[in-house]
Structure formats: structure tokens, C-alpha cells
């Protein structure tokens, strides 16, 4: 089998043709059925267009047809661009234009998105289009089915994902078949997945961790089960019902499950593997999950999209670590690391901004202008600047310190927001905490949001003054039932920062009004 993503599915097809590749909405789809469906869709796409498009957009949800559409895009031999139907149409249009998308593969979940895109001036041939949508429709023709997936070269772009850009314009990250081939070869060597495994699929298909779910499973002949939102309320029952053996999510999912009482000792006995990525993993979250899933090996994974899904792994062992956070572990074999100091020059010590070079590195952003400041040449190698500050651990792996842009100056004191978060979590009654910086009259104040028991602000501030310099103790405290999550189910720090700023401005306006009333 070749090393492409299509080749990984073909490997699963050879291992387990009549076992379910997918169980979505209660419907099992075997490897043979999904393969045949994807061949029909890919062939129909190529037959319906005069020339293969440079890229196909896949605006889909997580229903049974979504996965056939994604696989069909790969089978057609062109670049796949997963699109989130819930995103604003103007943003999706920017992605479509940046990636050179020439056709769409859609499912029923995409109908509102297609209508909104059409209103934005997008009119693209659309295959498997839901009824009533405004795009030019391509016919699904079984007679046009491909006999086999179209071949791809290692240097060909397998997929493009988009990350947020500092300009507000999404940045397109192309990932090649060579990138993914190296990645999955390492994972095949590290893990023992097989046809009897059942994988969770918590991530939306436009999030790169979904590629881990799908192609780890499909390369092993295993089954993928998309997790519906309502399942988190009764996760132990859902996991048991599905016979799930492999779990992968952001750490925020642990908070959701804890809140519904799903982390009781032994509550998740069927799990063999548990993976977390996308945000920092606290030791408390790891401990609680390990108690609920005592038969599972737990790993903390880390990696920006530019380095193909994940680039480090740390196998969890109980213990205390810096800022009470699980280390991110060692960088994958075959890669080089470089640390940069605050001045952007190579650092001499064991702490700095993590830069990585190697076979999982993207060729560069779709728009070369976005490369500026993100890549550097050092001793003949091209490195990606992750923007993450790390410290070397005793075992040679890496401890995550926080984002470069999450290090702020407060009253002349440099502070890591992650350090304030960690200190707040040690306060009795606090379950989770996130600190944000609020601009105030040319300087910055810190505001802290927390979940758990509504701890009085004075008590929380007193607790923090025992652990932190007085200058960096937050000025504002807000209790929430739950921290907001973004579309990738990570804690939405931008929303919290906007909320804190709005509340600070509202409070300031109220004080001004009171002073005016008193002076009258």
C-alpha cells in the first residue's frame, strides 16, 4: 500500500472489508461500502467537470455522508479543503478563494452554508448537493465510478486547513502526502491499533486532530464513531454501548464529563488508549481521567497545524510538574529543535520559543506573505516558529510554559498567564481557571474567570497573593458555570478577553455615572 491517506484507507479495507469503518447516527458503514461510495463520488466529480479542480471544498457535518465526501475528495486525486458549515460565509469564501477550490462535496448539514455562500457571490459546481441548494449541481453517476483511487505523489498537497491570522484573514496551511506518511508511520510504530478497536471522533473535520482519528483507525481496519454533543451528558454509557477503546479530545472535554458525574472511578473501563491535544492538559484533569479509565494508557499530544497534526507525545505517569501541567514530551524522531530567546536569536539555555524542523513541516502557507516571521533558516534547515515557550524537562522532553503572546507585562512585572491559571486552580472550590489581559489606560489589568464553586473574589485574591507577586494578582474575578469553547472545543480565550473588557468598560461607565450623580 502507498503512504497516502487514500492508501491508509485501502489498508484498512484489505484488513477488514466487512467490518464497520464508520458508525454514525446509529448506522454502520463497512469498509467495502464506504470505499465503493467514495469511488462513485470521486468518479462523478471528475466526470462532471472538464478538468480536475486544484482543490475540492468539503463543507460537511459529521453524518454518514460526510465521511464518504471527505474520502471521495482524496480518491479524486486533488487537494481536500474541509470546511465548517457553521463558520460565517464571508470567512468560508476567503478560504475557498485562497485554496483555489473549484468544486464542493457537500452533505445535508451544508444546506444553510451553501445558501449563505451563494449570497456571498460563491457559485461552484457541487456534488452530492442537498435539495433546494442554489449551487450548480453535479450528478452522482454510478457508471462514472473510479476503479481505484487516483494516484498522488509525496509532494502533492493532501489537504489544506486554515488557522486564524493576525490580520483577521485565515491562513491556509497545506499538508502534503509526504508529511502525513511520515506522521502515520511513526504512529504505526508507537501504537497497537487493530481491527477490533473503536475510535472516538470528537473533532470537527476541519480540525487537524480529526485526521488522527480517521486515519489511525482506517489504517488499522478499526471503527470510527463520531461523538454527538448530547453524548457528553452520559459519556460512560455511550462509550460502553459503542465498545469504544480509543478516546481523543481536547482537555476541555474532561471538564464537560466531570460536570455530569462521568469521571467516577472505573467509569470508562473499555478504553485502551486516551489522547488529549489542542490545549494544555492539567495534572488534575489527567489524574481524574486516568481514575475513570484505569485500563487506558494516557498520552498528552502537542502540535501546531503547520507540523502535521501532532509533533510531540508525553505518556502520562502520576506526578507533579511545572505549573501543574502535563509535559508535552519529546519531539517526534527525525526532527530537529531550536530554542529562541526573547530577542529572536538562538538561546543558549533550556528555555525559549520552540522551533522545529523536519519531515512533518508544511511547505509554507498558501499565501507566501504569511510566511514572514513564522519560518527561519538555521544551519541549512528550515524551522517553524511555534510561538510556544518551553523548558527542557529532565527526561529530555519539553515542558509547556505558554504562548509567547500570553506573556504580558503588568505594572512592570512580566507574567505568564498560565502561571496565574495554575495558581487559581489550587484554590479550594475552583475547578478550572483562565486569566486574560484587559487593556486599561495604556496599561494592562488581569481578569480571572473560574468554574466550580462561586468562591468570593476577596478569598480568591487572598489565596493568589500567597502564591504570586502582588502586582500580577488579577483585579477582577468572574464565576462561570462553564468556560466557553470555540468551534474546535478549546477554551475560547478571545471570547473571555472580550467579555472581560466589556465588563470593565461597563463598570467604569457606571462609576462615572455615579460620580456625576453625586456632583449634581
Question: What function would you assign to each model-found segment?
Answer:
Residues 1-160, 176, 282, 286, ...:
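AMP-binding/adenylate-forming domain of the ANL superfamily
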Residues 171-198, 206-245:
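Conserved AMP-binding/adenylation subdomain of ANL enzymes
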Residues 219-222, 248, 258-325, 336:
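Gly/Ser/Thr-rich phosphate-binding loop
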Residues 60-64, 81-96, 108-111, 132, ...:
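ATP-dependent adenylate-forming carboxylate-activation enzymes
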Residues 145-162, 169, 193-199, 205:
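Conserved pre-ATP/AMP-binding loop-to-beta segment of ANL
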Residues 4-6, 104-117, 124-150, 180, ...:
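AMP-dependent adenylate-forming
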Residues 60-63, 84, 193, 203-207, ...:
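Conserved AMP-binding
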Residues 38-40, 154, 173-194, 201-202, ...:
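Conserved structural elements of the adenylate-forming
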